[in-house]
């Protein structure tokens, strides 16, 4: 009995050490795969629309085109942000009707490290900036001019995903008025698409 009792703790310790080594191995493998997944994602892209990289350059483009800057403040751990990105902002960014024509759309990851050029050219930390703007409750959507000033009501959270694009249209029209831009969007993306098609059809064809 004494021999058996003396061997059990030793066996347990060896097994425990083996499990610890396996756990450390799996943890290292997990973080390696996570790092690879992050590095494999295109730089400056969040999901399917662009991550904000330079406020100063974006502000210059906004002033030149008289287009509002639309920023969605989000984070990797925010499930509602992912829903909003996938169902609303990614289709708007990829559809060809909005980016550079109706607005300048960017994602602002408040959990991203480092700094970017601010509207004044000075280093800007996204997390600190979000806190200062009161946009650290994600998702929060802001409408800014080329100087970084809010020019339309912000949208905090998601009240109704089906009506969200119409809400963006409404706020964009408010922003256009502040910017002196005569552009006005109809209530829905479908009507906006029809509007663009009608404008294209009314343009004179190029002569051969």
PLM features: residue spans?
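Bacterial N-terminal signal peptides that target proteins for export
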Residues: 4-24
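Bacterial N-terminal signal peptides
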Residues: 22-32
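Boundary at the C-terminal end of the N-terminal hydrophobic targeting segment
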Residues: 35-39
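A short beta-strand-turn-helix
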Residues: 50-68
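Short active-site neighborhood of thiol/selenol oxidoreductases, capturing the structured segment around
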Residues: 65-78
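Conserved helix-turn-beta segment immediately C-terminal to the redox Cys motif
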Residues: 67, 86-108
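Short, thiol/selenol-centered motifs that function as redox-active sites or metal-ligating centers
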Residues: 75-89
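Non-catalytic, surface beta->alpha helical segment in thiol-disulfide oxidoreductase systems
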Residues: 131-132, 136-177
């Amino acid at each position: 009995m004494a021999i058996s009792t003396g061997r059990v703790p030793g066996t347990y310790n060896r097994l425990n050490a083996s499990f610890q080594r396996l756990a450390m191995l799996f943890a290292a493998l997990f973080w390696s795969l996570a790092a690879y997944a992050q590095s494999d994602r295109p730089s400056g892209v969040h999901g399917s629309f662009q991550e904000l990289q330079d406020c100063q350059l974006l502000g210059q483009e906004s002033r030149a085109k008289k287009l509002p800057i639309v920023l969605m403040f989000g984070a990797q751990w925010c499930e509602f942000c992912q829903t909003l990105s996938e169902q609303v902002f990614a289709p708007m960014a990829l559809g060809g009707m909005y980016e550079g024509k109706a607005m300048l759309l960017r994602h602002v990851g408040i959990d991203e490290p480092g700094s970017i050029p601010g509207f004044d050219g000075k280093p800007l930390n996204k997390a600190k900036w979000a806190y200062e703007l009161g946009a650290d409750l994600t998702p929060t959507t802001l409408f800014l001019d080329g100087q970084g000033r809010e020019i339309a009501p912000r949208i905090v959270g998601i009240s109704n995903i089906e009506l969200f694009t119409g809400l963006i249209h409404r706020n964009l029209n408010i922003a256009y008025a502040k910017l002196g831009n005569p552009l006005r969007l109809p209530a829905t993306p479908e009507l906006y698409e029809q509007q663009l098609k009608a404008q294209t059809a009314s343009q004179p064809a190029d002569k051969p």
